[in-house]
Amino acid sequence: MGHNGVPRLVVYHQTTHDPSGNLISILPLITRPGVSVSHLIIAAIHINEDPDGLTLNDHPPAHPRFASTWAELRVAQASGIKVLGMLGGAAKGSYTRLDKAEATFETYYQPLYAMIKERGLDGLDLDVEEPMSLAGIIRLIDRLRADFGPVFLITLAPVAAALLDSRRNLSGFDYEALEVMRGKQIAWYNAQFYCGWGDASTPVMYQMCLARGWMPEKVVMGLVTTPANGAGWVPFELLGSSLQLIKRSIPNFGGVMGWEYFNSKPGDTARPWEWAERMTGFLDRTKQISVELPGSKPVQAELDPDKEEGAEPEAPNAFDYHSDGLEDEQ
């Protein structure tokens, strides 16, 4: 399923430079023997009001500051890692512009098409965190498939709660309806199990998604790589136990994704690749691991997916990335 036979290990890479403008290299994800990343997702592509003003974070994708990043991503591809772009995210507007009449869609889609083509991306991750119609997302998926062919990867990044209840959703459209109508065109879902929209500390919510009818090979468990990137970070001891339970009971587990690379624990900004190293170990283990937490004992929980659990959680806060090293310009 994934690189070197493990379930998918997907890493998002948005903060490409530190606040001083120094490159944050992803080469350790490629070269270190204990790391087996299957997919890298470069974020975030924004469709702005000016149709020709497409940006990767705060600059045009062809800006010289990204030259080394694109070069490293080509090395990743040459090493067998698939590289996708991420469209959208917390910054609004991209999908609103693509959800308009055909002529307007075409005007805004063409620069996106050109960028994907120019950079040789293996796929596009659709992170829809603003209202969009079901017809609009289907039109976009159909166009990407028609333009880039059958091997092009199309993924989506719903909050995990949206896979259980269409009302707990940032995207506007119903993901179950989308899966029924275009599931064959969607490689998998990078489901966000964090920021109040999911819980990765136990297998329960993931298993609830499967009970709802989602195929495990299409649901990648999304994690924050550090508490600094959002609420819901799970300590490694607890996460390792949860992932081992999932792997043992679900042989075709879709894998994990991490948001995001540059400050991942345990190495933080000095050694951000260590998160992927830990995940490789968790996903690649064949022996049962035993995790004992101080004062802990086995807990059995029964959750009713139809039961109301209080108020709807708030949308995650926007993450302040340092893509420029020029914070006063943002």
Each predicted region: which residue ranges?
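Chitinase-like catalytic core of GlcNAc-active glycosidases
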Residues: 2-240, 250-253, 262-286, 290-295
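C-terminal accessory extensions appended to soluble enzyme cores
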Residues: 240, 244, 254-257, 267-330
